[in-house]
Amino acid sequence: MKQCGECGFPVRFASLFEWRGDGTILMKQRGGALLQIALLDADELQGLFDSLSEMIGFSVDHILVEAQRRVGKAIYANRPIPFLKLVPHSRMTRPQWAIKTAIDVLGRDIRAIGFGVVHVDSYRAGDHLALHVDNACLAPRLAGSFLGAAELVEGVPMTVEYRMDGDRLAIDIRRSEENDRAEERLYLDEVAPARASQDYERCDACGAPVKIARMIDWDSERGSIEDRATGHRDVMFAVQSLNSLQRELEAEIGPRIRNVLYDTQVRLSLKAPVVPIADDDGSFWDDYLLGLALRGMGYPDSFESGEGTVTIEISNAYNQTLYAARIAAALEARTGKSSNIVWHKRDADSAAYSISEAQ
């Protein structure tokens, strides 16, 4: 992957994503849906989904596939791939080599955002697409992305089956006779900027924040991103997928699922060696909040910290519940004590809360 000569940041990343000063990362689009992205720990995400499935008694994978299907359609609605839908469905007009070329567009994106290396196995126009991904992770996310892209190209409903064998993911997409019956709650959130803004130090050549270029390494051959501090694998994950998952679970189970998400993320964040250590309280929180912002998780509109307590207002968190849980985990790591949260406001697009040491 070609890198910026000044900061080492991948040039493809600079062309695909915009690191905004409000703590969000946007996928650059020419029209169509605006997509918000976050740089997340792949194992932590998988742990979140696995823990949710175990606690609620059923797998959330099918919800992730459906949510990501819509994200996949939105992403590729303005890429070269959709023009294939104007080409008649036949072996003469849609030979396999042409489809492989189109899938290469998706494959380069998949590789760039850390999900592995894509290979097309077979294709029949209007009927099926079989492919596999080496060094894959978060299988439902990948399956949903390719399902959405395939439906966009073919212009008909499709269905997907997938299986993991080690780190190789096999995906089989076939035409479906069923209409799209996706729930309206699986819509994509609109992205709005917060009031606060960070003045990042940016590379003069590519415009990327200098600190993010120093935080992570890219392995273009294996299609992976590595956090230099932890050695963990990171991925660029669509924020709208997470929020669609939460809406669906709230509809099926009720609002209590928020507490399950919160408690699970606190536990996972405490396990991960990502909390910065600093002697001064202000320096600690400045560093920690900046790290979350650089990963596209948002930045508070207001933040106050005291002895064993923090109070936050935020309007652009990647997910309000999960962001609050990360703050709680950081406080617990700093104090060595468990914490309690009091929500003053808890909407999808804005929240206010106080977190303090448990008494």
Region roles according to the model:
Residues 155-160, 335-344:
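Low-complexity, intrinsically disordered Gly/Pro/Thr-rich segments
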Residues 316-321, 327, 338:
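C-terminal regulatory/effector modules of DNA-binding transcriptional regulators
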